[in-house]
Amino acid sequence: MAKKHPQKPANLIAQNKKAGHDYNILETFEAGLVLTGTEIKSVRKGKISLRDGFARVRRGEAYLENVHISPYEQGNQFNHDPLRNRKLLLHKKEIAKIGALTKDKGITIVPLRVYLKHGFAKVLIGVGEGKREYDKRETLKRKEQDREMARALRKR
């Protein structure tokens, strides 16, 4: 089983709120990111978007794809491609486990959060299955009912 991760890391840079709405997250993993110099500078400034990102396992390695890291303003000719594929640093057993989980149809790997831990950029990835439209509506109804119950309990 994957390790338990803190709910809100101290140095949270970006969060993919849409992933929780669109996917049932089955398991989470913490992975390091291989970044160039201008990329880490942009990430530290918070210039990263996880919205359309996903991860893929290829030839025993995991890659983060379609995550946009804006070019660094002072990067001149050494700037990076904003949408390049970035390697994820995971243990071999974790990569094998993620690969086995994603063999099933409808299972996807999505980035949930990017944060700094001891000076290194980390990404929390979640393995999840896509929600159908009626599942999303059901989740919203349940959240609304919970809010109403909490409101009623506070008024007592």
From Swiss-Prot:
One of its GO terms (biological process) is trans-translation. The keyword rRNA processing does not apply. Belongs to the SmpB family. Keywords: Cytoplasm, RNA-binding. InterPro entries: SmpB, SsrA-bd_prot, SsrA-bd_prot_CS. It holds the Pfam family SmpB. This is SsrA-binding protein. Residues 134-156 are annotated as: Disordered. One of its GO terms (cellular component) is cytosol. Required for rescue of stalled ribosomes mediated by trans-translation. Binds to transfer-messenger RNA (tmRNA), required for stable association of tmRNA with ribosomes. tmRNA and SmpB together mimic tRNA shape, replacing the anticodon stem-loop with SmpB. tmRNA is encoded by the ssrA gene; the 2 termini fold to resemble tRNA(Ala) and it encodes a 'tag peptide', a short internal open reading frame. During trans-translation Ala-aminoacylated tmRNA acts like a tRNA, entering the A-site of stalled ribosomes, displacing the stalled mRNA. Signal peptide: none annotated. HAMAP family: SmpB. It is found in: Cytoplasm. Its main location: cytoplasm. GO terms for molecular function: RNA binding.
